[in-house]
């Protein structure tokens, strides 16, 4: 087996010398490329594109983070994930009473991750929501070119859906060089 690097489709268009969007591709004994693993595809920096929440009991969708959320998730080759997402139209708190509202448009944690099948599983070590610390959480992910679509399991989120079961549908775009 050999190890080569291959860029995702369209990832290096116009940036032939870039290595920001490459992931390892192993070759079989006959020299044919094998598909990259999900972990190979995840490693790197991803920008938040959209964050929608589906309520289980009603089937309605909430644009929980607003029309133009921002944030990043970073996966390292050695198994760390850092996740920081913010909703649209956030402004600095002017009073103590403003802080709880800001927490409703924030998701942030750091931990170790591993990949099993089509899921990444993280052991949360620090988080914006203390009840997440020490938990193991699963996310289903589909990577297509430079886009990653993530679906959470049904659960009760601390910051929306008023304690009802919901799941998040999150889209990321692989970050460009220097982004």
What name fits each language-model region?
Residues 1-29:
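N-terminal amphipathic/basic-hydrophobic helices that include classical n-h-c signal peptides
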Residues 23-110, 115-179:
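Lipid interaction determinants
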């Amino acid at each position: 087996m050999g190890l080569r690097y291959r860029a995702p489709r369209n990832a290096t268009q116009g940036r032939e010398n870039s290595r920001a969007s490459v992931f390892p591709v192993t070759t079989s004994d006959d020299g044919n490329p094998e598909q990259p693993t999900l972990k190979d595809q995840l490693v790197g920096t991803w920008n938040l594109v959209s964050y929608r929440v589906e309520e289980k009991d009603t089937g309605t969708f909430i644009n929980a983070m607003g029309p133009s959320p921002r944030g990043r998730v970073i996966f390292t080759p050695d198994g760390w994930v850092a996740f920081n997402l913010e909703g649209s139209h956030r402004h600095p708190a002017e009073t103590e009473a403003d802080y709880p509202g800001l927490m409703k448009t924030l998701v942030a944690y750091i931990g170790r991750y591993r990949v099993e099948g089509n899921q990444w599983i993280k052991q949360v070590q620090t988080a914006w929501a203390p009840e997440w610390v020490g938990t193991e959480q699963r996310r289903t992910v589909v990577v297509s070119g430079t886009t990653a679509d993530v679906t959470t399991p049904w659960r009760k989120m601390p910051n929306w859906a008023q304690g009802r079961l919901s799941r998040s549908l999150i889209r990321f775009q692989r970050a460009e060089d220097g982004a």
